[in-house]
């Protein structure tokens, strides 16, 4: 199993621990991280957290969750899923995949990578909206 990132509208963090797992883009700039159960932006501001399998924003509102390999929004609508180390949208089109630790778009171009992730024991998801 490998680490996966959905980019553009959603970033998904996968890690085995909660200590400063950094998400970097293809230019090696840190664009976010998870630390002690908090999801933080690259400047260290807390923008959300994970609690009881729910993804919550900094106000405590549930904005998404993970359910049987499906990524769902807070209304329960499937917006994507994981299959064979591929991240697919609700229409089953491949959005992103991981190859040798590098996160690539469906066209094969490099998007970014994870730093500090050793092995997967727990899966943590947080949804960032950049647009």
Language model features by range: what are they?
Residues 2-6, 12, 16-38, 43-46, ...:
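Long terminal segments
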